[in-house]
Swiss-Prot record:
SUPFAM superfamilies: P-loop containing nucleoside triphosphate hydrolases. GO terms for cellular component: plasma membrane. This is Hemin import ATP-binding protein HmuV. Keywords: ATP-binding, Cell inner membrane, Cell membrane, Membrane, Nucleotide-binding, Translocase, Transport. The gene is hmuV. It comes from Rhizobium johnstonii (strain DSM 114642 / LMG 32736 / 3841) (Rhizobium leguminosarum bv. viciae). Its main location: membrane. Belongs to the ABC transporter superfamily. Heme (hemin) importer (TC 3.A.1.14.5) family. One of its GO terms (molecular function) is ATP binding. Part of the ABC transporter complex HmuTUV involved in hemin import. Responsible for energy coupling to the transport system. The keyword Nucleotide-binding applies. It is a peripheral membrane protein.
């Protein structure tokens, strides 16, 4: 379980997020959503241990700011929103970096682990390509493969591991969006936990168990998809008169963007 309690972050003397609190459970996909600049990425960086914070962030009972980098690397993998690499690394070299940053439980199977990670993100055959030669979406999937090498198992020694994904599908076509979200969903079903910063509310409704909505650096709403995705919440958080509908087959909510546009 990841417990976020009263978390605040200040950067350059300015408060970016204030008093954020929610719980993410292993076996579930928790989405963080909200308008641009609402504090989603800052919240994720506090959870991952990348930013100093006030309040408390606990992973499996341990306070994040009290854990050493190697301890964090063993229990959580982080996919950043963007990754710029100046040196001409190949895809194989970048993916294998994940093997050196995590526990690497099976060093004798390093090549198989890297190959499986690339296959899971539909990049088999890209091993020898240079990272800079790839499209933005391909680079994003390479970075996810690296994370999957670092956190290759959802449960280690009986304790869940975590994937912290900041906008994991932002550069992807719809087919690969579904591939990556299914991968994240499967990680949860195998006992791990996922927190993902998301913009696509329909993908969020389709794959997430719980959603945390942020606005202006504060928590606006948190709960199940059905509890949070309402017409009233959409108007309060996004300022759009969006209409929430439901898929007839199972009642999954979806956002009808057309409803926010006035046509003559």
């Amino acid at each position: 379980m990841i417990e976020v309690s009263g978390v605040s972050v200040r950067l350059s003397g300015k408060t970016i997020i204030s008093d954020v609190a929610f719980t993410a459970r292993a076996g579930e996909l928790t989405a963080i959503a909200g308008p641009n600049g609402s504090g989603k990425t800052t919240t994720m960086k506090a959870i991952s241990g990348e930013l100093a914070y006030g309040g408390s962030v606990r992973i499996g009972g341990g306070e994040v700011k009290g854990l050493k980098p190697w301890q964090l690397a063993a229990i959580r993998g982080v996919l950043p929103q963007a990754s710029t690499i100046s040196f001409p690394f190949t895809v194989r070299e970048i993916v294998r970096m994940g093997l050196t940053s995590g526990l690497n439980l099976h060093p004798d199977k390093a090549e198989q682990t890297a190959a499986a990670a690339l296959a899971s993100v539909d990049l088999t055959g890209f091993e020898g390509r240079f990272y800079q030669e790839l499209s933005g979406g391909e680079q994003q999937r390479v970075q996810l493969a690296r994370v999957l090498c670092q956190i290759a198992e959802p449960i280690v020694d009986g304790k869940p591991c975590w994937l912290l994904l900041d906008e994991p599908v932002s550069s992807l076509d719809i087919s690969h969006q579904l591939t990556i979200m299914t991968l994240a969903r499967n990680f949860c079903e195998r006992g791990g936990g996922v927190i993902a910063v998301m913009h696509d509310l329909n993908l969020t409704a389709l794959f997430a168990d719980r959603i945390v909505l942020m606005k202006s650096g504060r928590l606006a709403a948190a709960g199940s998809i059905g509890e949070v995705l309402t017409n009233e919440t959409m108007l309060a958080v996004f300022g759009c008169a969006l209409r929430i509908n439901q898929v007839p087959s199972d009642g999954t909510p979806f956002v009808l963007a057309h409803s926010a546009i006035s046509r003559p």
